[in-house]
Amino acid sequence: MLETLSARDQAPADLYQSYSGFVIPAAPVLPAQETHPSLWFKAADLSALKVTFTADDFARARWTATQKLADLGKPLPPAPGVKDKTEVIHKYYGAMSIAARAHALLSLLGGDELVRAAHCRRAEELLLRAYDGPIFQLDSKDKGSAVDEIYRGSWLQNYAHAYDCIQPTLSPEADKLIRERLAREAQCVYENLYEWTPDSPHNHLSKPAWGLGSMALTLSSHPQAKFWLARALEATNKNTRYFFSGDGIYREGSHYLVFSLTNFVPFLYHYRNVSGVDAFPTFQPVFEMMVQVRNSHGWLPNIEDSYLRPTPTHLVAAAYRDRVTKLHSSAPLSEILTWSYQHSDLSPFEQERGGSGFNYTGASWDYPLELDELLTHDATLRATASNAAPNVFLAGGQTVLRNSWASADAGQRYLLFHGVAVADNHNHDDQLSFILEAEGQLMCSDSGYSRGTYAGAERTAWYNTAAAHNTLTFDGRPADKDPTNATPPVSFRVEQPGLVGEEKSATFGPKAAWHRAIFWIAGDFFVVVDRVEPKQPGETKAYLHGGRGTLTTDGPRRIWTYSADRYGPAAKLHAWIAAPEALVTEKSGELTYIKGDYAPFPYLETTGAHFFTPWLTLLKPAAGELQDFTVRSEKAANQHTAFVVRSGQEKTVIAAGNRAAISLEGIETDAEIVVVRRDATGKILNQFVHHATYLRVDGHAILP
């Protein structure tokens, strides 16, 4: 034995052990007897399983795709050499492991007996070559390694399933040789997990660990299997404890969430099916979060090192068939997860795949998405939209304001307010930023991951900087720059019909404090209130990005105009900025929603040498030109900043000050923030104050 089962935790306890994430029981559980097949199904399930492969169009398409992966007419390639190009080596190991898995599945569920036998022979041939070539001569720690540990997790799971399918047909001699090959790689991963990723427990630790866990369950009678599984659980728990919030937010961003999902979803099925350990309930908040945070297209945000991603919740829907969920008053979680995927617009990702060959998982060379879709699909599941309140306030720090779960029509609104504790990997300087989607179009945007790769110089020169996000800097410093497990505190939250909002706070180190409130008013427009409290002199900069639109100016109003594209229909965003003693300038910055689809677009930078009075930004989405909507800004130096908005027969006043008396449009108060919305008769529809001792509206005392 190279290691005991005791924890090997090299991470600082004050950072990696203290976040709100989750873990599954660390004690490894293996079956009393190794049995095959068992990872995805049992032998007794084969007849029923084959019927599901043609149950509907979705299943038939995935079955066809799986059969294409198992091409008996395609000769096997020779193993690459140690000096071959990185891409050649990487693609070889991915393709060989996928082919082994596909042929093995076809050997059980393919056509007639002769065809199945041919697939079985091919699968055996592939398994007897598993991990041939230079893999053990190459170092996974090398930057850009062809055998990076993040790939090895998928290769392990592919070979595990292949062996699981054909093991009962193997001769003792072939079985011994194949087990030796698979065990060698499992032992290599076991010994090197913490060498490859010695510090932060990010996805480079968890992905190979989930693969190691699957192989341990496959070779459960191996003398080292218990140790492999223990190490896998230990390492993956480090990741889920630190990078996930208790309510499911993944702090490396949507891209790495889906990238990791390609390994943890198979492991969850394998552990449940082989050992009877059901960890799906522990992971439930992750899949609920995907539904809670998705926009009207069904896309997860491109926050942190991320591109837009769909919600592949269909992969686990069947596992939650009878699970109660906060997302619906009566329907099980399985129906909500089925709905979320069925109502995801996959067209941008299919367009990307058609051009580049890459699917949305980030693991296209290593992970056969269609095969897992085939094995997890249940055509009998209903699709039911959530009937929970559409506005979501996650304790992990993300807030979503939306008009409905399903609407993508005119009047559609979605704003994500991001205030999550900063993790130490794939982070961007985006604290308290926001993303706006409205009228079905992406408007106020996050600039995204990079043009196409982690290694691209533009990623650190632009994409992960504060200027690429809808956020602020003070004296050149972004908010909450350093890793922390402290979620930005919420100062207040208001939830009224017609007025919803929240204020979160952050710091610019010891230099200044920042409070940002975002209000959604009349189900229509948004107002952002920024209050900075300097502790020393410094320049404040605010950045406002309008997505893939052209920018024009009409007096105090800025207008982003969007053409119909793969991200949404034609639309406009009308914006006003009220920032006393500050200068607003137009700049250009690059934006990427989908890998490779990048271009420069205009954004606004507001700069103030001194910050004395709150800054306000008003955002009014529209399908086209404004109709009966006017905005007037009011500024009183060192006292308050305000917007007076007339929309149809309604008038709304939003003002923010320094606790000095405000008297405006019949409103009198000493509040730091006040919002009053009235109809044509003067009736108050909404009113809100923050830190006020009095409020009078049209001479009537509201407070005290």
Regions found by a protein language model. Give the residues of each.
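Mature N-terminal, pre-catalytic/accessory segment of carbohydrate-active enzymes
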Residues: 2-63
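Aromatic-lined, polymer-binding surfaces characteristic
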Residues: 38-40, 46, 50-53, 59-299, ...
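Short, solvent-exposed loop/turn elements at domain surfaces
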Residues: 47-50, 58, 400, 408-410, ...
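Flexible, surface-exposed loop/gating regions in the mature catalytic domains
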Residues: 201, 388, 488
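Carbohydrate-active enzyme catalytic cores, enriched for enzymes
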Residues: 256-443, 494-495, 607-614, 629-704
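CBM-like, beta-strand-rich accessory domains located in the C-terminal region of large
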Residues: 360, 450-704
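Catalytic Cys-His active-site segments of thiol-dependent hydrolases/isopeptidases
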Residues: 444-449
